[in-house]
Amino acid sequence: MSGLALIITFIIAIAIMIVAISKWNVNPFLALMGISLILAIVVGIPLADIPNTIGSGFSGIFSSIGIVIILGALIGTILEKTGAALKLAEMVVRLVGQKRPQLAMEIMGWVVSIPVFCDSGFVILDPIRRALRKKTQFSSVAMTVALSAGLYTSHVFIPPTPGPIAAAGTLGIGENLFMVIVMGAIVSIPTLIVAYFYANHIGKRIKSADEVHEDLTGQDYDELLKSFGKLPNGFMAVAPILIPILCMALGSLASALGWSGNMATLSKFVGSPIIALTIGLIFGIILLGQSGKMRSFNVMTTDTLKVVGPILFITAAGGVLGKVISSAGFVGYMKENAAALSM
């Protein structure tokens, strides 16, 4: 199969998959695997090659990004459980000030959601939003929209969250995550600007229950602080995120400048995503020790793996679909037509 028929078949397959997940409540993993198998047969991939295509697509994702996703999730869990994420949020509030609470919430969400899953980030930061709402009397809706926008922007664009890592692996740039981080941060800027103005716009037109029925929301924030006891210092709160980024930047710099010798080898070693995030995890473990929560590290790891497991399998199933699409010649067809259009 080739040409327009290939594109139409692909569109129909994606539509069926979306319906299967959203309407028929089929597990995303099974939906992706099933559609991949059916698509492989329909587009004419030789039957003898289909098992190998599925296997290579699945294992390729695990080999390129699986460990990176696990390490990033572990770092995020540690930041959440030690209060480091809360410390990061407080640092942002001090930087921005309380006169623009919606901007503070947006930046907080953007920073915290880099290592922490966006849903957990919302749980962590929502008490701060409520506390700022009580102090500033600013629109609760505007602050919530800004927070959500910040959380989702970095979650979608910036590693080590699974989505951008998976995209990097599919595009063959999984070993250059620093570039993905930089490009994701750049793309985030216009997104955050638009979201900021939209939050202000919608906040003037809609009132939430928080504003209609005021309650003692600041108490939740105080209780949250008490549950952590003393928050980590600023350096240790940011180190598990910042150190891996610096390591990956060093590795990219070594490649770009053509370094050679032992220094280049060492720079590229610590700059590889797996090693860089392992170093970040080591700083996270030190943070756990300082917080007196080292004994709970095993439980944290187990809980994190339970959360990450389904994400890994769904991501790997997406890799299978990508491999089927590539093997069917869809990518080559798009390249040929793009080249023809450019001429």
Regions found by a protein language model. Name each.
Residues 6-18, 25-45, 66-72, 236-249, ...:
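Hydrophobic mid-bilayer segments of alpha-helices in multi-pass membrane transport proteins
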Residues 19-30, 134-142:
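Membrane-helix interface "capping/anchor" motifs
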Residues 46-135, 291-343:
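Membrane-embedded alpha-helical segments and adjacent helix-loop junctions characteristic
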Residues 3-4, 182-300:
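Long, contiguous bundles of hydrophobic transmembrane helices that form the permeation core
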Residues 1-10, 62-68, 120-121, 188, ...:
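Structural signature of hydrophobic alpha-helical transmembrane segments
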Residues 73-75, 109-126, 138-204:
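Alpha-helical transmembrane segments and, especially, the helix-loop junctions at the ends
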Residues 158-167, 250-260, 328:
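Membrane-helix interface motif
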Residues 6, 32-39, 65, 69, ...:
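Alpha-helical transmembrane segments of multi-pass membrane proteins, especially transporters
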